[in-house]
Amino acid sequence: IGTPIPSPTIAAMYPFIFDSIKDPGLSVLLGVDFSGGVILFNQFLYQIRKENNRNNANMIILGTSGSGKSTAAKLVLRSHIRNGCQIVAIDPENELEEITRTFGGDTVDIGKGGQFGMINPLEVIIDADEEEIKQGLGYTVLTRTLQSLKAFMRYYDPSITEDVLTMFSEVVQDTYKRFGIDFDTDFSHFTSNDYPTFTDVYATIKGRILSMPEQTHEKDILQRLQLKVKPLVTELKFYFDGKTTIRKDSDFMVFNIKELMNSEGNTKNALFFNILRFAWGLCLDTSVNTILMVDEAHVLLGANNELGADFLAQVQRRARKYNTGTIIITQQPSDFSDPAVITQGKAIFDNSS
């Protein structure tokens, strides 16, 4: 006859199983699962109840093209807007245009650059909280900025060598010093007009080269760096060389980068990273729940840039500290498993609920 099976075992077998997600609090109805169970999802569930594997508000949406990733994201965003959350979103395909207009949000067309939306890569993001500052860790603000600038240069020019990148960091620090900025600086009262631009960095490079009458190894590195930086202050100046022109007091900010996605690969990657870094700087107000949405995240991870992937992983790790939840959208898990960024990709997944 075979092995007898108790009736409780039979009752637990497919297709008789039934499950659902009914999060308490300010939840959004996402739909039903394969067994017909209702899915009521509260991204900030950890704030009201402890639950296994729900210890932060970070989420990743995966799916092939046309599978409904953006539709699901917009459902979640609508719920957060109604619940009074601050929204910061990077929108590569202009899919948030209607919802932004409906709810009175602000759209910044970064693809046009210049007066339409300039983000100064050298502006410092103050992402040290009060506890870190009390512990004397305020210097990490500038340290993280320098790391981000090195990541930016790797996106802008993947062929940049380590010696040129190290020299770039030294030159940037020298430029900051000319503006009264060092590791002990209190940035809390700084405005966008207080920071140097790439024009100032380029001037520092030229000044150091002119001070070296003879050809040396250091001068050779500086000259190679000059060639790398020059396009940033000439043909690409409307994207990278100027003071930040974007207001920072919006409750619903969308960065439209559709026009940017058609630009040259390295320029697109550098701009995407620069936008993400600035967007993270808008998510540091602990008095309100904030959502940071990053669509087409594979653009950042597909460039084999460890520093850039590490920045996204740091955002995932630090988001909870600032009452921020992330929505990272990409097409497939393999986007996070490239050998060059697999450590950071694992951290991005591990820090999602």
What are these regions (language model features)?
Residues 2-39, 45, 92-105, 110-112, ...:
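P-loop NTPase motor domains
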Residues 61:
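Hydrophobic anchor at the beta1->P-loop junction of P-loop NTPases
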Residues 65:
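The conserved Walker
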Residues 69:
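Conserved lysine of the Walker
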Residues 72:
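Hydrophobic positions on the alpha1 helix immediately C-terminal to the Walker A/P-loop
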Residues 79-88, 103-106:
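Post-Walker A helix-loop "phosphate-sensing" segment adjacent to the P-loop in P-loop NTPases
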Residues 319-336:
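Sensor-1/coupling segment of RecA-like P-loop NTPase cores
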Residues 344-353:
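Conserved P-loop NTPase catalytic core
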